[in-house]
Amino acid sequence: MSPLFVVLLIATTTFYHSDAFAVKRDHHMCDRTGKACLNNAECCRNEKCVLVDPNIRCFTVPCGTACVKR
C-alpha cells in the first residue's frame, strides 16, 4: 500500500464520519427555548431537537437527528 493511498483513505474516512458530512458547519443545534444544545441529551430533553440555520429559522426534527456537540 502506498503512503498516498493510506493518506487518502484516512482523509476520506474522516470526512464521511465527521458531522461536516451530515450537517453543514454553519448549522447548530438548540432546544425549543432557543438555547444552544451542549449534547444529545440536552437537545432531546423535550423529545425534539431544533436545527437553526444561519438565518435563525428553527424547525423541529426527530429526536437525535444531527444532535452533535458544537
Curated annotation (Swiss-Prot):
Among the GO molecular function terms of this UniProt record, one is: toxin activity
The record's Gene Ontology cellular component field reads: extracellular region
Q: Where located?
A: Secreted
Q: What is its main location?
A: secreted
Keyword set, alphabetical order:
Secreted, Signal, Toxin
Tissue expression:
Expressed by the venom gland.
> Signal sequence: where?
1-20
Q: What is this protein called?
A: Putative venom toxin Ts29
Write down the species: Tityus serrulatus
